[in-house]
Amino acid sequence: MLPVYIPLQFIDKTSNNFEMPITWQIPTIILLTLIFHKKVVFTAFSIYIILGLFISPVFHQGGSIGYLLTPNFGYLLGIYPLIIIIDNLNIKNKINIGNFLIHGCLAIFAMHLTGIVFNFIQIIYYNQFNLFLYNLGKYSVGKIGYHFLTLFPLLLLIKPIERFKRIK
């Protein structure tokens, strides 16, 4: 996992970085969806999932068909609604800062909701209700704020993407 560091100016210079417990996967998918059509991103992400499940351990905690049984897989499935919601900006051709923030927040929320539903189905199937709140905190509540924060660096790319779309 490539950590995300935000430099902060503290009095103590030995700890001037704040590490975010997420990867650049979500912002990258959002950026690719803004640039390309959703069919291209769907295909690329589907190939990524197939590679991770059957060929090579490309996921965060490895790979293989056993990854289907982890709560993380639900959040990977949540990328599909994220792509659909972000692609609405391409369809409407209204890529601006306000629309991007609204659609970005909705997309991240939809991704987390998909992961929570997948997790809940697993909890019911395995009859392990005591793990639901733990998984909810670990995979959603603990990370959703950081995912929202990663929308702000992407704001710097909105104007160039908008110009690029007009040229095409």
Predicted segments, located by residue:
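Hydrophobic transmembrane alpha-helices
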Residues: 1-42
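Membrane-interface helix termini and inter-helical loops of multi-pass transporters
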Residues: 4-16, 57-67, 124-134
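Short helix-perturbing small/polar motifs within transmembrane alpha-helices
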Residues: 1-4, 58, 62-119, 155-163, ...
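Alpha-helical transmembrane segments and their cytosolic interface
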Residues: 1, 131-168
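Short aromatic-rich membrane-water interface segments that cap or initiate transmembrane helices
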Residues: 15-24, 67-74, 134-143
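Membrane-helix interface segments
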Residues: 38-43, 95-98, 132
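Alpha-helical transmembrane segments of multi-pass membrane proteins
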Residues: 26, 30, 75-83, 148-151
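Small-polar-interrupted transmembrane alpha-helices in polytopic inner-membrane proteins
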Residues: 41-56
